Curated annotation (Swiss-Prot):
Main function: Cell wall formation. Catalyzes the addition of glutamate to the nucleotide precursor UDP-N-acetylmuramoyl-L-alanine (UMA).
S-S bonds: none
Chief localisation class: cytoplasm
Residues spanning the signal sequence: none
Protein name: UDP-N-acetylmuramoylalanine--D-glutamate ligase
Alphabetized UniProt keyword annotations: ATP-binding, Cell cycle, Cell division, Cell shape, Cell wall biogenesis/degradation, Cytoplasm, Ligase, Nucleotide-binding, Peptidoglycan synthesis
Species for this entry: Bifidobacterium longum (strain DJO10A)
Lineage of the species this protein comes from: Bacteria, Bacillati, Actinomycetota, Actinomycetes, Bifidobacteriales
Length: 481
């Protein structure tokens, strides 16, 4: 992509926008940063853009496809692209191979981050410079996707891709790609579930070596079957059941591959490892977290699809620990007859993720902290499906009505406490105190809110940290010593 002497409008100066602006300026591009909230922006309104002299637009995920400036650019025939598209077109040759580093792309409604981290961990153990990038990126601009794509030292990029990023991305041809699952999320942004699924499916288009898909998700399986991939690209389904030919899954307590990605023939059963070797995939009592097992299977299929050493990858996977706020035990209080465990799954920001979290625990054992910014979601199906697990619910957030209505209609016998949303600073302390009134030995206080966090917290991480602090305080005050 030739960007010297071109004019690019960067819409939104967050980490990715600011980083891309720097990368483009280094290549002789005239960059116009537009952000109404950033004093350092070149312009603070799209009304001030001189569209007659614009060659490209980079749109932040903040802006949906129906935003006026997006429509204006498209009306004029100006390409509107994501940071992902720019990064893909700007990528440079690896200094050792002389060709661009392979990209492994991971998308899905849930499980993206854990899968991306596992993939990076295994490839790093195999001796490759394989950073995580994309939607997973921290505030470190040196690790933004545009920076990683233009760094000749990286051997592989493990890229978490959101549906927002994929919408304005069209030329990807990933080496390996995965869709973990698809459930209703961000439908208002995309304009419907079919548009949402279509954007997710872009990771499969023209994939070169392997695509990995959730064989237990009908929509994902359909997208994989329809995917137009490069000749010789392997299609690997993952399942939590015994795998069929073309799949990797769990059989008799073992991870078993029948896809051929682990070295056997397609249909041949190859035992890879005992599931008990992966302590991070299970609760303290040894029962498995199904969604983490699914993430591990996905990541393993991706790295094997790239050609990584099987034994080294498996060894790294056994020692992997998920990042914070992903079904993480943050406190445990001794009570009469046993203990109460506090589990932080603040990363469960939608109903699909919360369902996976709740389903990991025994019947009537969970005091569930739920609620937040609902983003138009309804929770009737979630509450109905998980009512057998939930002992009591404590509802937080400023958008409480959808969750309240779900319990009233689907599980009226489950006790519910509603936390006054007015004081953000004390909301989690009050929520944990309310949970404590329901607890008994063996119970789990689970914070998996099924909602976004920005109504009362800075981020899901801030929400999780506050829950952990409140849980530790409650345990010190109320636990037996």
């Amino acid at each position: 992509m030739q960007v010297a002497d071109k004019t690019v409008v960067i819409a939104g100066l967050g980490v990715s926008g600011t980083s891309l602006a720097e990368v483009l300026r280094e290549r002789g591009t005239h960059v116009i940063g537009v952000d109404e909230r950033k004093p350092e922006a070149d312009l603070h309104s799209f009304d001030d853009v001189d569209w007659d002299h614009v060659d490209y637009v980079m749109s932040s995920p903040v802006f949906n496809p129906r935003t006026p400036f997006v429509l204006e650019a498209q009306r004029r025939g100006i390409p509107v692209m994501s940071e992902v598209e720019f990064a893909w077109q700007l990528r440079v040759n690896n200094e050792r191979t002389g060709t661009p580093a392979p990209w492994i792309g991971i998308t899905g409604t849930n499980g993206k981050t854990s899968t991306t981290e596992m993939t990076s961990e295994m490839l790093t153990a195999c001796g490759l410079d394989a950073p995580t990038a994309g939607n997973i990126a921290s505030g470190d601009m040196s690790m933004s996707l545009s920076r990683c794509a233009t760094n000749p030292q990286h051997d592989v990029l493990c890229v978490e891709l959101s549906s927002f990023q994929l919408h304005f991305t069209d030329s990807l041809a990933l080496d390996c790609a995965a869709i973990t699952n698809i459930a209703d999320d961000h439908l208002d942004w995309h304009g419907g579930r079919e548009n949402y699924a279509a954007d997710k499916s872009k990771v499969f288009h023209n994939a070169k070596r392997a695509i990995v898909y959730n064989a237990q998700d009908a929509k994902v399986s359909e997208l994989a079957a329809e995917a137009q991939t490069a000749e010789g690209c392997r299609k690997v389904g993952f399942t939590l059941e015994a795998p069929q030919a073309g799949q990797i899954g769990i059989e008799d307590g073992w991870i078993v591959d029948r896809s051929g990605v682990a070295g056997g023939a397609v249909g041949e059963s190859v035992r890879l490892a005992a599931i008990t070797d992966f302590t991070h995939l299970a609760e303290p009592d040894g029962s498995l977290y199904p969604h983490l097992v699914a993430d591990a299977l996905t990541a393993l299929a991706l790295v094997l699809g790239l050609g990584a050493d099987r034994d080294t990858a498996l060894k790294a996977l056994t020692s992997f620990k998920p990042g914070g706020h992903r079904i993480e035990t943050v406190a445990e209080a001794a009570v009469e007859g046993g203990s109460v465990r506090f589990v932080d799954d603040s990363k469960a920001t939608n109903g699909h993720a919360a369902r996976a979290s709740l389903s990991s625990f025994p019947a009537k054992s969970v005091i569930w902290i739920a609620g937040g910014l609902a983003k138009g979601s309804r929770f009737e199906d979630l509450v109905k499906d998980q009512a057998h697990t939930i002992k009591a619910a404590v509802i937080i957030g400023k958008d409480q009505q959808p969750m309240i209505e779900a319990f009233a209609s689907q599980a009226p016998d489950i006790p519910v406490t509603i936390i006054d949303p007015e004081d953000n600073d004390t909301v989690m302390d009050r929520a944990v105190e309310a949970c404590g009134t329901y607890t008994a030995a063996g119970d789990i206080v689970l914070m998996a809110p099924a909602c976004a966090s920005m109504d009362q917290f800075k981020s899901y991480a801030d929400r999780g940290n506050r829950f952990a602090a409140a849980a530790k305080t409650w345990s010190e005050v109320h636990g037996l010593h």
